[in-house]
From Swiss-Prot:
GO molecular function: ATP binding; microtubule binding; microtubule motor activity
Organism (species): Oryza sativa subsp. japonica (Rice)
GO cellular component, one term: microtubule
Pfam family, one: Kinesin
Domain of life: Eukaryota
InterPro entries, per the entry: Kinesin-like_fam (IPR027640), Kinesin_motor_CS (IPR019821), Kinesin_motor_dom (IPR001752), Kinesin_motor_dom_sf (IPR036961), P-loop_NTPase (IPR027417)
Name of the molecule in the record: Kinesin-like protein KIN-13B
UniProt key word Glycoprotein: no
Keywords on record: ATP-binding, Coiled coil, Microtubule, Motor protein, Nucleotide-binding
GO biological process, one term: microtubule depolymerization
SUPFAM superfamilies: P-loop containing nucleoside triphosphate hydrolases
Binding site for ATP: G243, Q244, T245, G246, S247, G248, K249, T250
Family of the protein in this entry: Belongs to the TRAFAC class myosin-kinesin ATPase superfamily. Kinesin family. KIN-13 subfamily.
UniProt domain Kinesin motor: residue ranges: 152-477
Amino acid sequence: MNGGGRRRYSSEQLMFDVPANAGGGAGKWGQRGGVRRGDGEIFVSVEPTTPARLRGGEAAAAAAGESPGQRQQLSPGLLDLHAFDTELISDFQVPGIGMYDGAQKFGYGNGGFDDSDPTFAPNKQMSKSTVFAESNFLKAFPEKEKAAPVAKIKVVVRKRPLNKKEISKKEEDIIDIEQQSNSLTVHETKLKVDLTEYVEKHEFVFDAVLDEDVSNDEVYRETVEPVVPAIFNRTKATCFAYGQTGSGKTYTMRPLPLKASQDILRLMHHTYRNQGYQLFVSFFEIYGGKLFDLLNERSKLCMREDGKQKVCIVGLQEYRVSDVETIKELIEKGNATRSTGTTGANEESSRSHAILQLAIKKRVDGNDSKPPRLAGKLSFIDLAGSERGADTTDNDKQTRIEGAEINKSLLALKECIRALDNDQTHIPFRGSKLTEVLRDSFIGDSRTVMISCISPSSGSCEHTLNTLRYADRVKSLSKGSNTKKDLSLAAAPLRESSPSLLASAVPSFSSAEVMNDITERSNFGWTKQQYVKEHQAPTFVDRMQKVKEDTEFSLSNGGYFKEQRTKGSVPVGIAEVPDTVYQQGRQPTRKARDLTSDNNMRNSIAYPIIRRVVPDEDEHLNELLQEEEDLVSAHRKQVEETLDMIKEEMNLLVEADQPGNQLDDYITRLSGILSQKAAGIVDLQARLAQFQRRLNENNVLLYAQCP
């Protein structure tokens, strides 16, 4: 990126020059599309239905005063639907609302949509005729082309301020944020071979980056507000927060549902008045692989799939609401019931994944006797924080089991994202209850917003980098093209550890030239991470990359992989094998090795051991949870049988008090009842003893502490 107001983007994006003396929006670029006239004036379109982008001949036609809809002949390459900006905007025109004027009606600030997006300058206005002309221009394309798939996931990163605990430890803020370019830099302190410290920089670029001074209102306007109108058009929108424990996920997510419900009710009472829409609220959590209703005294729920492979929560109680105060009371009730605990990293850590759903349903033909039909849904998911065993050494065994279950579900979520990113035919959504709930967030007509919460302290540097890499993989998720298999045969690109601003300056190519390109671009326009496949490296590189990703959220307390090199450390044109080192516990200082010994060390990494340990721990955890459920079920059955036998004993006593009773019959029946009770107790004791032995074998038995 050069100075003087000149910015260069890929050929799918709008590229224009703004004079240095241009006031107001100098240097800004239109995300929805734009036309540059000969005199340098820029018209930016923010029409929410189809973000068209005019280039080449359209710009000349617009400068001449000719409407794009009047062009009868459309030459190839005029409109690249795969290069649309992927900001989460609804796919329909709201009746009575044009150019997002409705955002001013129910916004929380005095400004409109332009104020909430830093890429739109306040003085950049546009005429409605330009928008309507672009809409007519798109009508000339076939429906199949207009429905071309684009990325539907927006990734926002929020940085929290240093807390008192970090300040008392004199930890430093290692994250620098540039909101103008939506980028951030992590300054990681490392040690050289001679034990001298040096700082390594990791650069990331996302759809939006928010610093510690941003309020929750601004977070809402940046993330959830643009997708609220879409849920009235059979769209399922999801907003979830991800990050390490104590990074501010619950603080970020707590006010968002209330603000979204205010906007939904306002749209229902104004824009969609008398159309039969109703709003329903439900709130449940996933704790230890089980589902509990937070609005119904934590009653246990079951997750099922219907014939259309849609996830249904059996027994979930929904409340129909019509005002904001009722929603606020329900949210506070659910938050008070949610499972929380104290860990070494956070005093009030969320030990469960909480899911709040705002469902919009519509009456069928205006008939109240029939159940309403689902029109759209907005889900808010507050994920439990990812953590390592080293962070929870001062906690009991139950806390460690909770952490293992949390990490297992987050690992399953990462596997689903990786499968979608690699265009695999099978997506392992059934790996955990969390991924089953999130199935609708990644497939079908969906809109997803991911808020990655990061800690700025130097002590959380490793967690922060893992969170940012996780978010970067979600950001690169795009179903718009299947060119990965073809690109794998092309020349090897420069390996990078993270996306950078430098990568954004590399121009992309048209669909005819993509096959010859050595880099692959997502719909956001940033270079996606790829590793070198050359000579004998492919098998080793693929294997090591998979090991690193599989063990990033490992259930073990010790080993993990950590990248030793970052982008920019290799000259252009030189292939490099990913340099990963298996480590146990804390990271030791790495001594210098020559290339031969380094390769031998890599080949000797215990890859089968890692692949063998993690499934065993998963299997043991699943077996313990299943045995716990069996024990509780057996106990419940024993209590029910005991109640039935008590009723029978009471009837037997009544008969014994009657004159002329048969003593032999009384003795026989009483003996049978006592034998049945004794057999049930012995069976339950045997189950309990077996479960205690299993807990002792796995060193997870909890003993009550004496006062």
